């Protein structure tokens, strides 16, 4: 599959040309609407800056959160526009709508090197519609914002696994290119799937087994070891017959976990100890117990020091490491030790030459929250769900469409 890149578009020339960019600017906000982790905004800058420096008239589409019933002031991209402007070093206009009169007027008024951010694309229900016609109608209106002669750049890796109007459908209408972020993510994930140096260690955390089931089953036949931590480890411990107290538990997944343990017992690695407490609170005192001796009135919020030591020893010998999901409730300092310990072990292995990939989402947020240098890892992905689905071998709509011939061309590259 040949995917045209941003470099191809820049070589064609973008001066005076309208370019629609789908970025992933879905950053976390606190209760006051202040951005708490601008990592995704930072990751979007290289592609946008290259286009703006080339004289393009850039229109950015992005989402924030999951609006339920149309526009929600709490999910406006206003704080994102301000933060993006600071990082780009230029003013970022924010449209008052998506494809309405304000967006149209602002898009028409753009001059070379200007950038316009559309309001939260998910305020328009057609963006995430299951109806192909509804999505295509929105995509046509988005394409009009950069017409005539416009182009589309896909740079939101965190959404490429979604068949949505601004991710998939618009690429069927405009000449389409992979932005630097998306191209880099594809390169790294291809390396993980096709040219993996052994031993290959996978570290999976997070709360739910159901979210990671596909990637566990896919990677269990490819990896030398899969470390299980986070809230999901308690369902695995329950599958071994252990009591897990009041810990997070997916009862409906116990039989599945038992099957996985039976089938991949030589690959899966579970904690030998955990850190428990009586209530889910940052100030609730921690207690380390064996994984098979969790008191009935306590819940596990982190893996224990013995587990960290074992997992770190395993990781120290790895040549390839993929990590997705924290080992505990890292937002609570008393329960961040497991996540920090695993992160530091991966950093140490990377320093010895291992190829390490942090699979986006909460694990990437944990790296930043714990003050660990992002440059200490080989790659930090911006897409948790997209990374997992790619490694499962699923077709990602937002990637597949980029491999199609440009509008008006045949498979061979000539005119239709």
From Swiss-Prot:
Its EC number is 2.7.2.3. It is found in: Cytoplasm. This is Phosphoglycerate kinase. GO terms for biological process: gluconeogenesis; glycolytic process. Belongs to the phosphoglycerate kinase family. Its main location: cytoplasm. One of its GO terms (cellular component) is cytosol. PANTHER family: PHOSPHOGLYCERATE KINASE, PHOSPHOGLYCERATE KINASE 1, CHLOROPLASTIC-RELATED. It comes from Mycobacterium marinum (strain ATCC BAA-535 / M). It catalyses: (2R)-3-phosphoglycerate + ATP = (2R)-3-phospho-glyceroyl phosphate + ADP. One of its GO terms (molecular function) is ADP binding. Keywords: ATP-binding, Cytoplasm, Glycolysis, Kinase, Nucleotide-binding, Transferase. Substrate binds at residues 24-26, 40, 63-66, 122, 162. ATP binds at residues 212, 300, 331, 360-363. Monomer. It is an enzyme of class 2 (transferase). Pathway: Carbohydrate degradation; glycolysis; pyruvate from D-glyceraldehyde 3-phosphate: step 2/5.
